[in-house]
Amino acid sequence: MSEMTPREIVHELDAHIIGQKKAKRSVAVALRNRWRRMQLDADFRQEVTPKNILMIGPTGVGKTEIARRLAKLANAPFIKVEATKFTEVGYVGKEVEQIIRDLTDIAIKLTREQQMGKCRQRAEEHAEERILDALLPKPKNDWDDSDSNSNTRQIFRKKLRESQLDDKEIDIDVAQPQIGIEIMSPPGMEEMTNQLQSLFKNMGQAPAKRRKMKIKEAFKLLIEEEAAKLVNQEDLKEQAIELVEQNGIVFLDEIDKICKRGETSGPDVSREGVQRDLLPLVEGCTVTTKHGMVKTDHILFIASGAFQMSKPSDLIPELQGRLPIRVELDALTADDFKRILTEPHASLTEQYIALMATEGVIIEFTESGIESIAKAAWQVNERTENIGARRLHTVMEKLMEDISYEASDKSGSSFVIDADYVSAHLDNLVQDEDLSRFIL
């Protein structure tokens, strides 16, 4: 789990996301509270439940980007899902409990990597011995000179560690990768499907196969194989489930798309039905997975939505009550667009400069040019559909279209993107109401 303070988390998010201080502070505090809770006594810890968050803001202002960056900072099981992908229990489609099953799979992978990292040194030693056995087979006769053989082994061990034998080929027994069998499961029978897949998986274990490969490649494969042998699978599952239950984070995107709109007749299986199914998950229930039973009482849920066609109050009251922290994200201004073009790590302007440099073309964005690009994107957003920062991608692509097309023929050339260049390439499209609609 991440031990970063809220200030450090916000600082990391600032490197990639412009503005939205309230949202950053809320997710930073929520992430820190996960760490704080784990410092409490076990009995008291069970009484502290996470305060789930609802992020509200127009499209393209950074809701999903906050989730992506948070996943890298969390160092805990984290899953981002779209609420629109699920249907009510009993109908064709994915059930919401699949979220917890997928989160548990992520925790298994995370825990396995951590455990394999801890026993990597032992795995390297075992892999080294197996390679030396392939290079110097053990003598079949008991009267062979063991001292001489041991000295030779040490000489080869030294060469192996100094990478002098990397390109030498050897024959070695390597475990065969298991062939996965995908079974389509009917709704409500996912657990039975998982058991069948496990059965086929165990039946299909192939014996090790002798392969000829270079020592460098063989060493990597053998380290992974030996590390996997050293990991206790039962302990792995227990630790992963504990990790999910105590530190798991679920990011529910597009939650506004499952709000009920107007009066409709008949069952609403992909909207209000999904909300009802989400209630026990958010409140706390037990979900059956192929790795064991997972309790969701202390999993943190962060929901987000644009709410352009609906309002947060359109969510069913029970779900509203389970998302107590509300954060409103601000619409982006022309100044925000200017900062987005220059301040974040690997900003759009830096990306185009780097891409064109591969062709030997030098691109320079002036201050006036960046201001003009930001203003053009903001104007198109105001006149047509406001899609936030995503507008910058299409405006920049249109602006750089000619240079990108001719770059391979103009190696050594330089281009200055100033206000005049931007005006010449974008003014007609921005000013023409009909054409500006085609700049998606």
UniProtKB/Swiss-Prot annotation:
Source organism (scientific name): Shewanella oneidensis (strain ATCC 700550 / JCM 31522 / CIP 106686 / LMG 19005 / NCIMB 14063 / MR-1)
In terms of one coarse class, where is the protein primarily found? cytoplasm
Q: Which family does it belong to?
A: Belongs to the ClpX chaperone family. HslU subfamily.
What functional role does this protein have? ATPase subunit of a proteasome-like degradation complex; this subunit has chaperone activity. The binding of ATP and its subsequent hydrolysis by HslU are essential for unfolding of protein substrates subsequently hydrolyzed by HslV. HslU recognizes the N-terminal part of its protein substrates and unfolds these before they are guided to HslV for hydrolysis.
User: Can you state the subunit structure given in the record?
Assistant: A double ring-shaped homohexamer of HslV is capped on each side by a ring-shaped HslU homohexamer. The assembly of the HslU/HslV complex is dependent on binding of ATP.
Which terms in the Gene Ontology molecular function aspect does this entry carry?
ATP binding; ATP hydrolysis activity; peptidase activity; proteasome-activating activity
Subcellular location(s) per record:
Cytoplasm
What Gene Ontology terms for biological process does this UniProt record contain? protein unfolding; proteolysis involved in protein catabolic process
Query: Which GO cellular component terms, listed alphabetically, does the Swiss-Prot or TrEMBL entry include?
Result: HslUV protease complex
**Which positions in this protein are listed as binding ATP?**
18, 60-65, 253, 318, 390
Report if keyword Transmembrane helix is assigned. no
Identify the gene encoding this protein: hslU
Family matches, as HAMAP family? HslU (MF_00249)
| InterPro entries according to UniProt | AAA+_ATPase, ATP-dep_Clp_protease_ClpX, ATPase_AAA_core, Clp_ATPase_C, HslU, P-loop_NTPase
| Name of the protein in question | ATP-dependent protease ATPase subunit HslU
- Respond yes or no to whether keyword ATP-binding is given for this record: yes
Keywords in alphabetical order, please: ATP-binding, Chaperone, Cytoplasm, Nucleotide-binding
